[in-house]
């Protein structure tokens, strides 16, 4: 028995067809594919002490919600994770005791609603440069901490795409 858990990204493209089916030439050799769910959760979080995104005022809550709504988890699963993940709807994975299949606590991807939420709370382009500004008119750049790994570079690209579509400048702070 050979196990690849988790399967390296470069292996996935070599053994699976679209739809996560084992390639026929491998099946013809007697190789089988058994899939299992790993109870692993990856999440992003906000520094609640940060003057730009932190705090509990209505506009800061709206900002964090809009950022969450602008991130396309399905695209992350399809592109970055090569179809090898499930969207997390809660902190307890589906194969663990305590998971509630009726609870869905993750923000749904909805870019138009995210933009409308930012507009409503004053995060608009006030100086005409194409980027949203803070409600007080100051420039708005979101900083995201990230590592230098190839995997994190892919996530960074998706974050950049998501926030650019939302009209928010982004600056990645690379950890060494």
Go through the PLM ranges and name each one.
Residues 1-82, 86, 91, 95-176:
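Extracytoplasmic/periplasmic ligand-capture domains
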């Amino acid at each position: 028995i050979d196990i690849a858990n988790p399967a390296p990204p470069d292996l996935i493209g070599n053994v699976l067809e679209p739809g996560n089916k084992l390639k026929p030439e491998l099946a013809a050799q007697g190789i089988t594919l058994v899939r299992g769910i790993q109870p692993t959760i990856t999440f992003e979080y906000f520094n609640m002490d940060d003057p730009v995104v932190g705090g509990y005022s209505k506009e800061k809550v709206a900002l964090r919600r809009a950022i969450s709504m602008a991130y396309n988890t399905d695209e992350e699963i399809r592109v970055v994770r090569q179809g090898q993940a499930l969207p997390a709807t809660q902190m307890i994975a589906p194969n663990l005791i305590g998971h509630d299949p009726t609870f869905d606590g993750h923000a749904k991807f909805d870019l138009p609603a995210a933009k409308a939420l930012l507009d409503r709370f004053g995060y608009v382009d006030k100086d005409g440069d194409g980027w949203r500004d803070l409600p007080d008119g100051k420039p708005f750049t979101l900083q995201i901490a990230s590592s230098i790994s190839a995997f994190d570079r892919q996530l960074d690209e998706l974050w950049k795409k998501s926030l650019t579509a939302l009209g928010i400048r982004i600056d990645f702070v690379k950890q060494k």
